[in-house]
């Protein structure tokens, strides 16, 4: 992964990411490097350009730790993991959930508090189930959010390497 401070890169929490194919297409269009980080082997299509695979081992949070450690201004982090989103934002990265939700410093506190509350309610048996299933509108929202994040970074002076 190119780690020049003024370049754009995409870091993907890949184990359960439903939008990897979309990330590859957008990255290719913008000539951006992508790092797929996972706890196990993830296949990357041959035609995907500039994609690096990082397989981490160890604890369940090893992929999150790797992504948080490599987050920086100019990085776009794609994750559904709220604590990881918070850590990446602290490092100055742009963060997008696979459903297209853009996390910011001003929204992550409430999002993290809601996540923690729902975890507590699930543990107490008050709430069952989880988030809604991934839908086509989520894929479309994600593509829009990723393009928007890249455009904003380019306007801020970051560039493709």
From Swiss-Prot:
Could you tell me which Pfam families the record lists for this protein? DUF188
Provide the family line. Answer: Belongs to the UPF0178 family.
Q: Tell me what this protein is called.
A: UPF0178 protein BOV_1904
Q: What is the lineage of its organism?
A: Bacteria, Pseudomonadati, Pseudomonadota, Alphaproteobacteria, Hyphomicrobiales
């Amino acid at each position: 992964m190119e780690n020049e401070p003024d370049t754009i890169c995409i870091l993907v929490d890949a184990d359960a990411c439903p939008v990897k194919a979309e990330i590859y297409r957008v990255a290719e269009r913008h000539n951006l490097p992508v790092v797929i980080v996972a706890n196990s082997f993830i296949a990357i299509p041959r035609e995907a350009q500039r994609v690096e695979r990082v397989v981490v081992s160890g604890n369940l949070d090893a992929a999150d730790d790797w992504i948080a450690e490599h987050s920086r201004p100019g990085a776009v982090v794609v994750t559904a993991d709220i604590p990881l989103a918070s850590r990446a934002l602290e490092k100055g990265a742009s963060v997008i959930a696979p459903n297209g939700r853009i996390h910011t410093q001003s929204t992550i506190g409430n999002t993290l508090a809601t996540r923690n509350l729902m975890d507590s309610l699930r543990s107490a048996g008050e709430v069952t189930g989880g988030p809604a299933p991934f839908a086509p509108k989520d894929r479309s929202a994600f593509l829009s959010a990723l393009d928007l994040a890249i455009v904003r970074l380019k306007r801020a002076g970051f560039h493709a390497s």
